[in-house]
């Protein structure tokens, strides 16, 4: 990451450090520019594509290995793809009428139930 990118990254971290999922979902909706006839389908396909990009970056990291400096670069690239995954999750949740915070809470509840039943350790 060059100096300008680092400064921009630090600015963004400071500006949004206390952001809640609901705030993110509302702000992300401003960028959901696709035909309403493709609501649900468009973000679902985008989510699959971006998740694939995360997997591909991790695969290349495993294949190529990395020294400490390139590890930080690859980590930043993976983080950017995770951000894209988050955007598509927010768009899909909006199109389905769900709040990300409610989905996150329901997911944690489900995971806790699995842990309590000894299904995950």
Placement of each model-derived feature along the sequence:
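Flexible "arm" and connector segments at domain edges
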Residues: 1-121
